[in-house]
Amino acid sequence: MSSVSGVRTPRERRSALRSLLRKRRQRELASKVASTVNGATSANNHGEPPSPADARPRLTLHDLHDIFREHPELELKYLNMMKMAITGKESICLPFNFHSHRQHTCLDISPYGNEQVSRIACTSCEDNRILPTASDAMVAFINQTSNIMKNRNFYYGFCKSSELLKLSTNQPPIFQIYYLLHAANHDIVPFMHAENGRLHMHVIFENSDVHIPCDCITQMLTAAREDYSVTLNIVRDHVVISVLCHAVSASSVKIDVTILQRKIDEMDIPNDVSESFERYKELIQELCQSSGNNLYEEATSSYAIRSPLTASPLHVVSTNGCGPSSSSQSTPPHLHPPSQATQPHHYSHHQSQSQQHHHRPQSPPPPLFLNSIRAP
């Protein structure tokens, strides 16, 4: 008991001393941990600067990036121990290679700027939203013959080309990346083309404001591995993600192309899909050329460009835009010459020779991506 004069008893003094020492040890321990990760955070600990005895080597920002790159789990622990969420954003340069993407950051693309935003500071992501993984996308790839209508937006990008569809069955990452992107952004238009026996994909976003969650990016890179380059760019005022194949790895998954092709042939193509390909015609041409396929002008000099979805020349399409006219039934689509106004000189030379021999000379078929571009 304390005396009347207010003097503490020995027991009270020992209790107060133990409490003081315990609080001091807690402050010292917190100061040591904070100064080890980032010396600047120690000044925020009760507003007291660290004492000289507690001084530790401070890590620079570059040191932290190197550590987090080698040990991603430490980055998560570092973010979890922070009491206040960081609000910093980092601008990115276009074209942006996804392999240079910082972990745990989302991508915000808009007319106001292109930035990487930390996941914990992102205001667009929903906490209760669960996105599919690369494994989920592989399961969907295996079961795609049973879910044609669910993934119909993906098959529109083949424009009913059996050659492109056959290539896709040997390249699961193309489907996986589309599947992951479509789960995060529904307003996308995929387009496929081939070069040197490899299938490539361009995904056009129809909105000017695009948000790609960090979980989606991580799973895309998991599916792409080192065989595909995934880049984001703005082409003709549209956000585009290009998936280019560098090497085709052997896949143990086998898809029945015959069943897949038959179901796709039976699928109706909506008019708005035809209109979207017509609207993005010049954009698609530029994307194909930028990815290394520069055969467009050479091929159009000798072949009529066919409509992507009806497989018929554009100049015999009916005026209502819903189908070919009656004249298209009398002549096979691949024998229609281009219009007189757009015929090049050497095409006229070939045409005169074909009239003399009563048949058109044999020439190699046009590139596969020409089946998906309409003539002006």
Swiss-Prot record:
General function of this protein: Plays an essential role in virion nuclear egress, the first step of virion release from infected cell. Within the host nucleus, NEC1 interacts with the newly formed capsid through the vertexes and directs it to the inner nuclear membrane by associating with NEC2. Induces the budding of the capsid at the inner nuclear membrane as well as its envelopment into the perinuclear space.
Chain residue ranges for the region called Disordered: 22-57, 316-376
Polar residues composition bias: residue spans: 33-45, 317-332
Pfam families listed in its UniProt record: Herpes_UL31
Gene name for this UniProt entry: NEC1
Highest taxon in the source lineage: Viruses
Family: Belongs to the herpesviridae NEC1 protein family.
Post-translational modification: Phosphorylated at serine residues in the N-terminus. This phosphorylation regulates the localization within the inner nuclear membrane. Phosphorylation by viral kinase UL97 at Ser-19 plays an important role for correct viral nuclear egress complex (NEC) localization.
Alphabetically ordered keywords of this record: Host membrane, Host nucleus, Membrane, Metal-binding, Phosphoprotein, Zinc, Zinc-finger
Subunit details: Forms a heterohexameric complex with NEC2. Interacts with capsid vertex specific component 2/CVC2; this interaction directs the capsid to the host inner nuclear membrane to initiate budding.
CCCH-type ZnF: 106-211
Keyword Transferase: no
GO molecular function: zinc ion binding
InterPro entries in the cross-refs: Herpes_UL31 (IPR021152)
Protein name listed in UniProt: Nuclear egress protein 1
Organism: Human cytomegalovirus (strain Merlin)
Residues modified as Phosphoserine: 19
GO cellular component terms attached to this protein's record: host cell nuclear inner membrane; membrane
Gene Ontology biological process terms in this record: viral budding from nuclear membrane
Matches recorded under HAMAP family: HSV_NEC1 (MF_04023)
Localization annotation: Host nucleus inner membrane
Record carries keyword Phosphoprotein: yes
